[in-house]
Amino acid sequence: MSRLAWLALGAGCVLLAQLPVVPAFWISLANITGISAIVALGLVVLTGVGGMTSFGQASFMGFGAYTTAILTTSAGLSPWLTLPLSVAAALAAALVIGAVTLRLSGHYLALATIAWSVSLFYLAGVLDLTGRYDGIPAIPAVSLFGFSLADPRRFFGVIWVCVGIAVLSTRNLLDSRVGRAIRALRGGAMAGASCGAALIRARMLAFLYAAALAGLAGWLYAHLQRAVNPTPFGLPASIQYLLMAVLGGAGQIGGALLGAVLVTLANDRLQSWLPHLIGAQGNFETIVFGVLMVLVLQTAPDGLWPRLTRLLPRRRARSTPTLEASPLSRRDLPEPGSPLLRVAGLTRRFGGLVAVDSLDFYLTAGEIVGLIGPNGAGKSTTFNLLTGVDRASAGTITFRGEDLTGSDSPAIARRGIARSFQHVKL
């Protein structure tokens, strides 16, 4: 479908929701689905593309919700004024938490996000500012040009316009230069850094972007429900949002929307059916979601969206116009035979093992030189030291008169030193 067709479809859905023939139950469910989809879109960037698992997105949603709740009820600010403040609060929290948490990776990062998610939940439950576990009631409704949007049917359009904005911004981000750096975080971090990508910055940007979308979702949630308390922003909610991304397809924008629809519907039905089947009250749907996540990871690790798209008719490829691109600018090349790279006393120790010992060599521009040695001689370690993947225990590296000793991979790549790998890395 073309962009105009999608726009017409979206406008039609918004108008359809205003008709009284559509039951209020389905409008409420669609509103929750839209808010959940915004959070899941952040997880597409953070987890599906960036490879960083987070169980704390509901907490950032809570920052946005509580910010607007406090400012509209206590300070009397307009909800529209609190919208950027809610997103800013989530960003500020993500900046502080990310500065500490993003030093970790893999399951350590996931465990860290669980820890501060639980901590923030209990903190919100004991502070007078947040109304303790009772929360903050009587949040004013959003109004547009003097027209109140207190009715969920009227607020439907605001939510799904925000979903559309989130989809477009996510797609544009992933297609940008920053997006390519974020893609390099998953499985190709070393190769990306060696090509000049600032991956530490990319990790933080992905974390902040996901938090910003969660803050937006929190603002929408607060003015939809007109009350907030810690429960919707705890660890179980974060698990559900992660399940939405995984179930639909964590690396796909459409997967976030599909996952939000499926999990929201399943959650509503399971909360009604399971107590009758089991004969007891409890959050049994959490157990079902846990089992469902394991099954999806085993049977469809890429999610359901890629499988669904294979069943749909493919669009005919558009003809791409031929464009003449101007040549890229090139840096000044050194004169053949001029000094280029000088290594003096380069040493790398791993505890008591010396992998590289007092290596000295000198290269001039235009030379082709090979480094030859048996397995374990330190060839790969030498290349790692020269390209900033590893740091030398002693010695200096000078390139075109500039000391690069201790510089990281992106900085060295920007100076003009590139490398290849023994295994293919894209």
Per-region residue spans from a language model:
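ABC nucleotide-binding domain signature
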Residues: 370, 415-425
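Conserved Walker
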Residues: 380-381
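Helix-to-loop junction immediately C-terminal to a conserved catalytic motif
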Residues: 387
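Transmembrane alpha-helices and adjacent helix-loop boundaries
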Residues: 1-325
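Conserved ABC transporter NBD signature motif
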Residues: 395-404, 414-415
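The feature captures the beta-strand-to-loop junction immediately N-terminal to the Walker
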Residues: 47, 369-374
